[in-house]
Amino acid sequence: MSLSKFMEKQTSLNPLVIGATLFFVVLLVAMILIAPEQTQTLLNAAKSGIFANFSWFYVLAFSVFLGFLVILSVSSLGNIKLGNDEEEPEFGFLSWLAMLFAAGMGVGLMFFGVAEPLTHYLSDITTGSAEHKQQEALLHTLFHWGIHAWAVYGTIALALAYFGFRYKLPLALRSCFYPLLKERINGKLGDLIDIMALLATLFGVITTLGFGASQLGAGLHQLGWISENSFSLQVVVIAVVMSLAIFSAISGVGKGVKILSELNLTLAFCLLIFVLVAGPTLYLLSAFSDNIGTYLSNLVQLSFKTYVYEQEHTGWFSGWTILYWAWWCSWAPFVGLFIARISKGRTIREFIFGVLVIPSMFGILWFTVFGNTAIWLNDGEAAGTLGQMISSPETLLFKFLDYLPLSGVTGLVSLVVISLFFITSADSGIYVLNNIASRDKSLAAPRWQAVMWGVLMSVVAIVLMQSGGLANLQAMTLLVALPFAILMLLMCFSLWKGLNADKKYFDTKVNPTSIFWTGDKWKERLEQMMNQTQEKDILRFLKHTVLPAMRELRQELIGKYDLSVQINTLFEQDEPAVELVIQKDLMRDFMYGVKSIGREVSEQLINDDNLPHIQHSMTYEPYTYFFDGRVGYDVQYMDQDELIADMLKHYERYLSLLDDVGQELMAHEQTELAE
């Protein structure tokens, strides 16, 4: 069997995407194994080059992402739904917020919750009195973990959800560029987009796994279960955790993993509450309010600050802010895909508010509780002991807990939380990598692919950590995130173009229902209004008014204009319907349908003696629906000729708009683009 046949029959992978990615990764691993010192020098030079020449770009790009989302949220484009106009959200608002809250949790908060504020507090980036230094330390931490990170996630998530649920394209990164590339998203340019996204995601996940492995080793050492946190131990940790993640991915125990994830969130929240209560509670609550104010009041200045006038701080700026911005870029497809999948049916305004505000507020709370408490302990009971350990940030959380009650219990809980975050991140990472690398997002990936991704992530993480520790992982993230950040700016332009095409398309209205009313039929109209229609009445209307109107129009379109037209009668389904479909070769078919829609009637109306015609708890109406997902309207007062006129109005709208903006929105069905 040839390689191409094998790839087609035995995998869901896109040969070019996976081939280019594996070539890059294998080349990197080979270089490290064959010439470790030279490769280390090369990575350091590349990292220094990006710091020196592209830091400004990262700063401006992240400000653009945030500004872009804010503009969308306050404009009329914010009213657009992520799905059809009548689409209801898949999850309730509170459930959706809870899932966004879950997306904001992870290994990073456990690793940096204590370490980062304390490190900034003791560095020369903060100045003045101890109180002022503490305030600035929290400010810089919150800037790194706040709304900018979620603006990056939100940009990708919004593009994925919009083009996936509104344009009916596959939930894939290449789909986000449809307004710019059209059908070329299915060609080599689409493959290039996926390659860049795959590399960024791969190294972003690997970096997170590296942080998790080093902190798990430190936790085991702190609890006295091992003698030292060695590299060999971290290899064992990565192997064990990745084996569990692979088992989860191939065994169909997703429901069990979901339960573990919910348990883990509960444990993390309990740990947060414990530190809040066991620490200086009133001080922390006051600091939480103060930190929010300090963060918001300095947000604009920090968003554009490159330290060009403070050269003594450029090393700190590169090693913290720019590395974070690169990490968030590489992590964005991972988090963005999750957010997109749970956000169907939300308006863009609601989506942006939820994604930017809820996780950011939780991040402020987390770093306030852990960061402010750590600094408070370091300056008090710990007498500087915690500050002496900032060069080993993986150990700081456990040393920090030693100064609080029940340190043995909380240390064990922290270890469990980190382990479960590690497992669920790796499991989800396997899914996302499979999704990006697949040639058809609707295909189920074979089990061996999960094993391949798990082994690949483990090997690359181990090799990079062995050659240069976490610094090498961060260097690779920085390198692959730069082109992806450029890609994201193009994504913003593509999304803007799509949204404006959408607004122009759907703002073109057709006057429904009563536009045809004239005074000569007022008695008939009144009689219809005074009748509480039931399903049998609507079925009769569909069969004796709508269907004959469609047949008459179909006969004219076929006989005189040689169009391909069909009528679908769907009287046996839960919502009886009839459809007129005018078929096209390249564009999406025009479809005008009418279906029976039931709605509940309130008890007050039924019991009102002045409304004797309302006797039933349900009333039914014939509502239109269309090929492009627009919200329909009631047509029960139309006669046969008026229905034909209504269908022609929509067909004229279809033809005039399709040549202008509609071709970007309605040119293809989802199945065609998934092939």
Please report, for each region that a protein language model flagged, where it lies by residue.
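N-terminal alpha-helical transmembrane segments of multi-pass membrane transport
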Residues: 2-133, 273
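Flexible loop linkers connecting adjacent transmembrane helices
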Residues: 2-8, 41-47, 74-93, 118-140, ...
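Membrane-water interface regions at transmembrane-helix termini and the short interhelical loops
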Residues: 3-10, 35-50, 69-90, 137-144, ...
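Extracellular/periplasmic helix-exit of transmembrane alpha-helices
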Residues: 112-124, 276-298, 360, 364-391
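Membrane-interface interhelical connector segments
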Residues: 297-314, 372-408
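Loop-to-transmembrane helix boundary motifs in multi-pass membrane proteins
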Residues: 10-25, 182-191, 229-246, 250, ...
